[in-house]
A protein has these predicted regions:
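Bacterial Sec-dependent N-terminal signal peptides
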Residues: 1-20
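Carbohydrate-active catalytic/glycan-binding domains of CAZyme proteins
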Residues: 18-255
Length: 255
């Protein structure tokens, strides 16, 4: 009987733990999540592709219960002109945003993929800002000369701001055998500056290298990215370096 009761108690205990949350924590179309935390509140942004309003923003205090508080793109004048969402294709639009917070300002950096009827596919990397993540958000600041997709924005502790990007080694606007690159970014002019440095080709030959995110902990830079495409070979890789411009050492346990 004691054996039975002990196991019943354990089962009930584990059941209680399991019922505290269920995956997915957000049901529906919320791919490519990016999160930042400010004063104990978590803010989440996701890809929205061709849909409008775009860039849904959720807020949570526990990473389990989320409230939709607004959209990064909710005005027509944010989505026409260079940053065109008016007639974007069903496989285009807003991909893999990153949300960051620095000195009182929220930033979202992302790519709009647009394929005109005539001409090559365009990869438009841009940033929007807000003091309140619920909105309103600024007009898009287009980062000219930034190739590739899925950019990250990194604020270093020396005051420098870095654009972390990806591009194809052969065609800088394709998504084949890729590499990751970093370049300093001037947020007063919304322009890249200085030298662009290719820093890593991933752990599996750079196939479909995408979604980079830069972190820094105890003086070491950690560069995380996805690789292998979006099917069975999709995997997460990470590498480390003492300098943001590399060289980066791939984790031997990748992928």
């Amino acid at each position: 009987m004691k054996f039975f009761l002990r196991h019943v108690i354990l089962i009930v205990s584990f059941s209680s733990i399991a019922q505290t949350f269920t995956n997915p924590i957000l049901s529906g179309a919320y791919p490519d999540p990016s999160i930042c935390v400010v004063d104990g509140d978590f803010y989440l942004v996701n890809s929205s592709f061709e849909y409008f309003p775009g860039l849904p923003i959720h807020k949570s205090k526990d990473l389990v219960n989320w409230e939709l508080i607004g959209y990064g793109l909710d005005r027509e004048n944010q989505c026409n002109g260079t940053n065109n969402l008016v007639d974007v294709q069903s496989n285009g639009g807003i991909h893999a945003p990153t949300i960051r917070y620095h000195e009182g300002i929220f930033y979202i950096i992302t790519t709009n993929i647009y394929s005109p009827v005539k001409g090559p596919t365009q990869f438009i990397n841009f940033i929007i800002t807000a003091e309140d993540p619920a909105g309103s958000w600024s007009e898009p600041h287009i980062i000219e000369g930034a190739p590739g997709i899925d950019p990250d924005l990194f604020f270093d502790d020396d005051g420098k701001v870095w654009f972390v990007g990806t591009h194809d080694k052969g065609d800088k606007n394709a998504n084949g055998i890729g590499e990751l690159w970093v370049q300093e970014l001037d947020l007063t002019k919304w322009q890249l500056k200085g030298e662009r440095t290719s820093v890593w080709t991933g752990a599996c030959g750079g196939c479909c290298l995408e979604g980079p995110h830069m972190y820094k902990r105890e003086g070491t830079y950690y560069l995380m990215a996805a690789e292998g495409g979006t099917s069975f070979n999709h995997a997460v890789m990470i590498a480390a370096s003492d300098k943001i411009t590399g060289p980066y050492d791939s984790n031997p346990r990748n992928p």
